[in-house]
């Protein structure tokens, strides 16, 4: 695994001058910034993977860090110019660490929402998606109510890849209504026009709704910013087949993530 990650490192940093000058998706920082961020994250991943071989008693924590940092690598590479196959590989190579980091005492909702949303956007295989379904089902059964609420938004996304007779219906409310009720409203829209309106309304408020997130305003801090991408909004749009043409240039909406099939080079 270390080799695979370093292979990614070599492929990016060994790229030609012409490739270095290609435009990137993010509009707030340049390629050099993201290369620095990538180096920082890959170094962290390799460090914690090495710890995993020698310090088993902290396995849970190390697995969680590797899983989280790998999602950040996907974010960084998408902010640059990463394509479907590369991002899929990073996702699937890190999925086992995310699963091994299961902790019913301290679940982190945003990490789980990002992992599920990206699983949908990156078209991961059904057997891997079922691992996410089982993970959240287990969390719903084992986590203490004070720490965790079976969540309507997570299950809307998870159910989108399940057959009708497999869909779960036990979630009754949103775990984070302030942040998520606008997005859940999209899923309940009466028709495609209402869904698009609700989607546009929500993406317009998305950044400010996340002002308590650790990444908020991270572009103002040194070597912290990996991109502002609303993966969960794009995942809902994809599941619902919403015409998102008007959002193509929205700075928070990862349009390419929803439209890999239309990219002939992928």
Question: Locations of the language-model features?
Answer:
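Short, aromatic- and cysteine-enriched interfacial helices/patches
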Residues: 7-15
């Amino acid at each position: 695994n270390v080799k695979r990650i370093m292979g990614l490192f070599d492929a990016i940093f060994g790229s030609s001058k012409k490739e270095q000058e290609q435009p990137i998706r993010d509009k707030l920082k340049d390629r050099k910034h993201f290369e620095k961020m990538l180096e920082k994250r890959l170094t962290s991943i390799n460090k914690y993977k090495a710890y995993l071989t020698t310090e088993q008693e902290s396995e849970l924590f190390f697995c969680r860090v590797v899983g989280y940092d790998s999602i950040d690598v996907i974010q960084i590479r998408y902010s640059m110019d990463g394509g479907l196959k590369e991002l899929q590989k990073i996702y699937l190579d890190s999925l086992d660490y995310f699963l091994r980091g299961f902790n019913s005492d301290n679940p982190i909702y945003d990490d789980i929402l990002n992992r599920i949303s990206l699983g949908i956007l990156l078209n991961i295989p059904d057997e891997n998606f079922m691992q996410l379904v089982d993970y959240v089902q287990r969390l719903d059964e084992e986590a203490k109510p004070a720490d965790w609420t079976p969540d309507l938004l997570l299950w809307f996304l998870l159910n989108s890849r399940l057959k009708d007779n497999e869909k779960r219906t036990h979630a009754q409310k949103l775990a984070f209504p302030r942040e998520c009720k606008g997005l859940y409203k999209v899923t309940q829209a009466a028709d495609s026009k209402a869904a698009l309106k609700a989607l546009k309304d929500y993406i317009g408020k998305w950044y400010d709704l996340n002002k308590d997130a650790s990444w908020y305003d991270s572009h103002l801090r040194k070597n912290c910013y990996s991109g502002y991408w609303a993966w969960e909004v794009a995942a809902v749009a994809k599941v619902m087949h919403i015409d998102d043409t008007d959002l193509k240039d929205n700075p928070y909406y990862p349009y390419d993530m929803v439209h890999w099939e239309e990219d002939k080079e992928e």
